[in-house]
Structure formats: C-alpha cells, structure tokens
Amino acid sequence: MNISKYSKKKFYEGIGLWRVDDAFADPMFNYLVYGFSPGSFFTSVLANDFLSAVAHSHPSNTITALKALTGWMQDYMPRRAFGSYEAVKEWLDMDETTRREILIMHNLICTPKQETFLEIKGEEYEM
C-alpha cells in the first residue's frame, strides 16, 4: 500500500498519544499498513496469548511499554486486526485495498483525497 508522509505522520501521532515505544510502534505500523508479520512476540500480543508473548519477549521489553501498546490497541486498533491468531492471519492475508479502507475508517491514516490536499497545500511535515 502506498501512503503519503501525511498518513504516516497521522498514524504515529495517534500512537504517540499513548507514548508507545518506537520498538513497539514500528512493527504495528508495518503490520497494519503493509500486512507484514510483526514477529513472534507481537503476533502473540495481537492474538492475546500471554504465555507465548512472555516466552518470546525480548529482555528489554518492559511492562510500561506493553501497557502503552495495549492501551493504544484498545483505543485505536481495528478489532479485526487482533484478538486471536485467526484474526492476525486474516489481517496478514487481507488485500491492501481492504486494509486501507479499514485504517481510514479507524482514522489511522488519511484518505487519498486528504493526502493529495495536504500535498498541494504544502502542509508542514515533521515526525
């Protein structure tokens, strides 16, 4: 899926409200936008598999970082994208047009019209 720098900014502004660590935010961005597998730890988190998440967790992962991520997931992430291994697999297998529509519906990225307008307007862009 091709998205503009404005959609990327919008996504990261939302995830930033929860102070989600970049090491957690980047895999979520790539999972949601591009349908990339987020790895064993994040797949377990997305599937609500606590035992597997802990088993696959990196020693530097903290409870504070995990709480921020799960708070953001509850507030922003499309319900279709998490909750079980089946939901994760369906998201990974989903075509990019459908993923884009869902992300727009959840206000995680801009519509193509919004992206074009911001580009023409020369909207400031800082990440």
Task: List each model region and its residues.
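N-terminal soluble segments of membrane proteins
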Residues: 1, 125-127
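N-terminal functional modules and adjacent low-complexity/disordered segments of proteins
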Residues: 6, 23, 36, 112-115, ...
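Amphipathic alpha-helical interaction modules
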Residues: 16-63
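Amphipathic alpha-helical binding modules
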Residues: 63-124
